[in-house]
Amino acid sequence: MIFLTLSLVLLTLVAYYINNRSLVSPSILFCGGMTIASFIAWINQKTWNLELDIRTLLVITLGAVEFILVGYITNFIFNIIYSRTRTQKMVPYNGIPEYINKRFRSVLLIQLIILCVAIFTIRQTTGISNLMSAINYINYIQNGFIKGQINLPSYFGIILLFNNAAGIMAGYVFLENIIVKRKFDFILFSNLLLGLATPLLTGARGDSIVFLIALTILGYFIVKEQNNWNSANTKYVVVGIIGVILFVFVFEWSASLVGRNMENSNLGEYISTYMGAEIANLNEFIKNRSFPIKGEIFGQQTFVTILPTLSRVFQFTLPDYKLDIPFQILNGHNTGNVATMYYSWLYDFGYMGIGILTIVVSSVGEVCYKFAKQSNGFRIIKLIYSYIGALIALSFFSNRFFENLNVNFLYMIILWIVLKYILFRREKNA
């Protein structure tokens, strides 16, 4: 484990310097997440009786090397093409006019109405009047802890998506007010909080985590556009570490809110399970199972949220199947049922899948990052990259990239475009 951890630390440093010391480039987000997970797994090596298989070591390290190389090549090609179409020059930061802040009051009203509708829908669908109990019930069914079926209305997911999309957009404006204008706007902060909290209504904290990471990336963009992209990052690293520590405590507390059993878990064990056990679980999968595993349909583990949309578009029957993500018990300790993004890829496509899908994730992330970095002020592409960057940062946890980049993400982009058109229009006298 120590060799894996040191290798990932070295690769993270390489990614940092070849990306002009940016803390939010795809390579840094990917390698940084894997490094943290590896370090925590190393600490728990004896606890979990973790004996790292050479194949696991190669999958993780070579996967990281490939991710960095693909990102570097994509960046090189992008710079060649981009330099031919646009002359690089320094421009002042394009701030958001004050009147736009006031328009988010209407958005807040819509978000509050959606929150009330969502709560009413949850209670009506589950038949449980207590909201926390209803949320816990939904969470238990969705995770397969209890048998049952929840048939939420088709509009439910869309209205929650609106709150999330509006929250991220308001979050950018809020952060600009804090960073550039040194001003705290309560309305924008409320927009942000509703966007952050709304996913918890289904008992899922994953989208709230993506939300927080996306806001961190957006804040970094705003800060760097005020200064220089090559300036030192020491204070941002310190702030980031403090933020992570605070987040861990809040994250543990939120577990009971969405129905997770915390009675037999301490903070250290909890952190280890969510931020390091993925390496151990991947190692168990590689050691004990043969792959790729032939399923009922192509890519059923990797493209689980994309296949339903494709089945409707191309009119093919999608078999009813369940994800094969068993919970692991290592040396008497529950290490959960997630095993990095590599688990799904190996399960469906074997080692070849890692080679191909790493190219997809790295190149898509790098292109979006470059467009976001080249833009000035508020742009939709920054919101898009902040979301994609958050998914890449969570690669150490699970296959978030392909799980979240589905039709709902397209709806989110459409919502951002519509909201920008409505909220960011110039005033007649502006």
Language-model segment annotations:
Residues 1-101, 188-195, 211-254, 399-430:
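N-terminal "leader" segments that precede or initiate the main folded domain
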Residues 19-37, 71, 116-127, 207, ...:
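Alpha-helical transmembrane segments of integral membrane proteins, especially early/N-terminal helices
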Residues 2-20, 66, 70, 107-119, 172-179, 194-202, 345-347, ...:
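Hydrophobic alpha-helical transmembrane segments
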Residues 334-430:
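Hydrophobic alpha-helical segments
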Residues 20-25, 172-188, 370-383:
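Membrane-interface helix-loop-helix junctions at transmembrane boundaries of multi-pass membrane enzymes
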Residues 80-236, 244-258:
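Membrane-embedded catalytic interface detector for glycan/lipid assembly enzymes
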Residues 137-156, 241-364:
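Small-residue-enriched transmembrane helix-hairpin modules in multi-pass membrane proteins
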